């Protein structure tokens, strides 16, 4: 049972507390919106590059009594759009939940921002690997087409 207070009447105290919570929430949401807009600017800069290669880096590992997994930040196609995103990957249940960055859990967004430079480095590496792979396959296709053309001429 709560202790009896001899201060302001309860409704007045509750109203004051609610005003504080509302003001703090407004400030938090404004800061979070600005934060997410800046990540959106990175998306805007990446979009015309037309990379089309998914890439993820681990932000943190987690475990519970029945599961373990990791939280990641990445560049991938989420909801039909290439963007910076977040995902939580479960090792045991093999489930994966992903979000567009601005829609992900706030705690994950805050952690993930420290890994954006690493993500860009990894994305550059995967893009270079993709280029090498395409170049190799293109050479193979050129040989294949050349052989087919020679056979067709006979």
What are these regions (language model features)?
Residues 5, 19, 34-37, 68, ...:
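Arginine residue identity/basic-tract feature
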Residues 21, 38, 78, 85, ...:
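Generic signature of intrinsically disordered, low-complexity segments enriched in small/polar residues
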Residues 40-98:
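Amphipathic, interaction-prone secondary-structure segments
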Residues 65, 69, 94-131:
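N-terminal amphipathic/basic membrane-interacting segments and domains
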